[in-house]
């Protein structure tokens, strides 16, 4: 089924350059998808809304590549197989999220330990604000495996948790359908807020001056490095029992996710922790 375009494009079949630039900074991350057809259908859902940064997380790179070449994936992509050909691969979710300033995890199940929970509208608005303030940085939308969804550890690797408003008596939503809903609303928000026009102006040298730029936020890679160092410090100091670490890392992640660390703050805490580790010997 074809729908008439809501906005004019520079060339027939293309979004305006400003809109393309914004949508290119949204990474769509599928964690251990089990069915090739769902990956293909997800590619179609993304292409029809103008997104094209498709990521697969799978420790088995050969299996991930095979999934993209599967006839079911190509058939379900229905013309979006170019997204399958250009799809990115990461060995772990942490690796996939390294450059991202914000990651929204989509799950219906509440957990004991989870990042701050947001409605779909709140989460996408937060992502939109970061896309506006930091015109080079990416954000990520993260979806778990079809049967079990995201694990607790995968969930804690993300910045925020979002759910979709569905029938509580029947909340089962296909992976590609969930992606389609989120992609549509995010595209709509980008256009409604005029972010595509801002990106167009920045591309023509009309962006904000360097002096007016916001402070650099810590990407996921810096935050992950800080978590590792703090855990090493807790072990070296005797504060943490290696045989019973409990939920120490989860608590750290939950604490940090309540705010958005600046890059210099993350480096300060990381450097201080490393120095203490050296002195502990």
Regions found by a protein language model. Give the residues of each.
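Post-transcriptional modification and biogenesis factors for structured RNAs
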Residues: 1-281
